[in-house]
């Protein structure tokens, strides 16, 4: 607990405390399953470092990339959705070449949601999908379709159009996922349990409009794969 409060204090100090960042990244990467099975130290270090007002929330200038990668990979496996969500700031401050070593971990964090903090768990998954689409990473298409079907129903009528907008950035390349999108549209319209009927139709219509746009698209971006 003292280490957690210490991290919060360092974040509050700001620039004069930046010399402590290497050690904080090192601590974030450490996992103590016996004494801290829920990763609470890691959780609060993530906030202190990567939140909007965190020590690295606005810039990664001067940060050792190897240490950063190790910490991010560990943080993306934290059990808390909000802790994972804070790491999204890293995605926005790295070039494609810089972020390539993190792509497998980013993809895994999309497919495997945090088991707790469900209210915040979607944030890092959508952020990851947006990143993969921005760089036309092929695996992003199937990950997006999977997430569309498995997403938390709460606020999914708002999230689904956002997901479809991301998918459209793949242009006609997204035709490979049209059959699965059609199945999901049918599910949304007819079979989704415990969800308002009108919102079910709304989501289904959103997918059908996306399918039509994909089929009409002439944009064919070059895709790359996660290595």
Model-based region annotation:
Residues 1-16, 36-62, 81-97, 118-137, ...:
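Structural detector for internal amphipathic alpha-helices that build alpha-solenoid repeat scaffolds
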């Amino acid at each position: 607990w003292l280490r957690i409060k210490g991290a919060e204090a360092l974040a509050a100090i700001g620039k004069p405390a930046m010399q402590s960042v290497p050690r904080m990244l090192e601590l974030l990467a450490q996992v103590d399953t016996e004494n801290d099975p829920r990763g609470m130290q890691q959780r609060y270090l993530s906030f202190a470092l990567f939140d909007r007002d965190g020590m690295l929330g606005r810039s990664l200038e001067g940060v050792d990339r190897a240490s950063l990668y190790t910490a991010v990979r560990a943080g993306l496996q934290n059990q808390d959705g909000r802790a994972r969500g804070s790491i999204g700031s890293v995605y926005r401050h790295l070039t494609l070449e810089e972020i390539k070593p993190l792509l497998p971990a980013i993809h895994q964090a999309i497919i495997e949601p945090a088991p707790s903090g469900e209210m915040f768990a979607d944030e890092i998954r959508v952020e990851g999908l947006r990143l993969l689409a921005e760089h036309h990473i092929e695996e992003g298409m199937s990950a997006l379709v999977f997430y569309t079907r498995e997403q938390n129903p709460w606020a999914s009528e708002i999230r689904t159009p956002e997901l479809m907008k991301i998918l459209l950035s793949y242009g006609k390349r997204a035709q490979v996922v049209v059959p699965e999108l059609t199945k999901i549209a049918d599910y949304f319209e007819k079979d989704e349990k415990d969800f308002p009927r009108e919102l079910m139709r709304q989501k289904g219509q959103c997918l059908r409009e996306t399918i039509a746009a994909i089929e009409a698209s002439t944009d064919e971006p070059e895709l790359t794969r996660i290595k």
